[in-house]
């Protein structure tokens, strides 16, 4: 079918293409089968999903069980197609702009977030983004699974990607879309925050892997608005966090639950993003989350589960920063208490060690120097902060006087 640009858009976000799938595939849309399984459900902040399966027998203790491979498909080279559904999308919309920029940056050489999934099979040699498309047909009055499946199938057919195991169709519905409540419903259904059970999910219907990504700003804070950043800078935090969650899970488990899943985990959902959602708060944890810088901008993101690390990590290129304390002067035999501060983007705990401390002083693994200096002198102290795959040192002078 003919594709035409929707209109000018920010230079850093590719311009969408206008299509009308309902005009071209109306019969197929009405007859779409419902044979998929919803997975990777991102619940609203503070809520849990309903267990979809019994827990598998395991010798590990949750939430620290690793993902296991179920023998099914895995995307070796993910390709993302962003499908904006509805006539009300505009070039200036913050959600569509954020999504286009996010997907354009994922897979690029500066992306050390997607590469957490390398251990499960996906590989990245450039941007995963295949473009933004706008289906200008109005969504049904109430959108259900069969509608989303039909939309994904029609798009896949129009683009020649039906049956492509590496293809992801992300269906981003326009603001105000109402969703069926038989699966719990979207937390911002019909344009306002509510008691819905999900923020997004992904599935496979036998033809193509697709994501149901409603208009996240309709749900507000319960789907991540200002989750990481304050004010206007955090408006689309939930958009990038949740879109990234579903993207990583579709890459590692495109035909759920046959890919990489922790089958013992019935609390979070058990996929690579589920175990770390909202900082792991579903499990009562404090997993890594924060801003991730890609070639196309900086985005709020959650961490992903790493079997190699045995926990949630935010990046495969960890960086540690350590704050140099001012030079110290201590009176002989007086008690010392000095905290060394460091941070990391990896999501791992930072531990400390020190060399050449004044006699009688020692540093704990959390960076607290304590004790009583028992010898006069001048020392050049070096403190090193270490995390998984990275370390950083700083030095300062410490004098012990009478």
Predicted feature residues:
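Metalloprotease/metallohydrolase-associated module, dominated by Zn2+-dependent proteases
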Residues: 191-237, 253-317
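N-terminal zymogen propeptides
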Residues: 3-66, 106-116, 125
């Amino acid at each position: 079918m003919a594709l035409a640009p929707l209109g000018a858009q920010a230079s850093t976000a590719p311009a969408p293409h206008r299509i009308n799938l309902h005009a071209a595939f109306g019969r197929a849309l009405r007859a779409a089968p419902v044979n998929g399984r919803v997975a990777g459900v991102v619940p609203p902040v503070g809520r849990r999903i309903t267990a979809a399966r019994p827990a598998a027998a395991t010798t590990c203790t949750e939430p620290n069980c690793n993902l296991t491979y179920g023998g099914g498909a895995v995307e070796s080279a993910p390709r993302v197609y962003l499908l904006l559904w509805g006539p009300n999308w505009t070039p200036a919309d913050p959600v569509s702009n954020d999504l286009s920029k996010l997907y354009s940056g994922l897979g690029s050489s500066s992306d050390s977030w997607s590469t957490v999934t390398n251990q499960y099979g996906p590989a990245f040699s450039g941007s995963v983004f295949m473009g933004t498309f706008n289906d200008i047909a109005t969504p049904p009055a109430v959108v259900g699974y069969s509608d989303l499946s039909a939309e994904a199938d029609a798009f896949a057919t129009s683009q020649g990607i039906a049956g492509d195991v590496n293809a992801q169709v992300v269906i981003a519905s326009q603001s105000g879309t109402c969703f069926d409540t038989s699966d719990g419903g979207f937390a911002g259904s019909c344009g306002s925050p509510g008691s819905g059970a999900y923020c997004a999910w992904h599935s496979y219907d036998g033809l193509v892997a697709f994501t149901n990504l409603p208009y996240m700003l309709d749900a507000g804070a319960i789907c991540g608005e200002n989750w990481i950043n304050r004010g206007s800078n955090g408006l689309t935090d939930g958009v990038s966090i949740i879109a990234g969650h579903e993207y990583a899970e579709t890459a590692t488990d495109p035909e759920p639950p046959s890919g990489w899943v922790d089958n013992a985990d019935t609390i979070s959902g058990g996929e690579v993003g589920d175990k770390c959602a909202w900082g792991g708060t579903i499990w009562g944890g404090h997993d890594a989350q924060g801003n991730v810088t890609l070639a196309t901008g900086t985005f709020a993101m959650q961490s992903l589960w790493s079997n190699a690390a045995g926990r949630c990590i935010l990046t495969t290129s960890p960086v540690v920063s350590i704050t140099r304390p001012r030079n110290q002067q201590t009176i002989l035999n007086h008690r010392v208490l000095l905290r060394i501060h460091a941070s990391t983007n990896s999501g791992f705990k930072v531990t400390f060690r020190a060399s050449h401390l004044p006699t009688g002083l020692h540093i704990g693994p959390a960076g607290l120097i304590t004790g009583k200096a028992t010898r006069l002198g001048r020392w050049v102290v070096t403190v090193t902060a270490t995390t998984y795959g990275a370390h950083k040192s700083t030095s300062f002078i410490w004098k012990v006087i009478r």
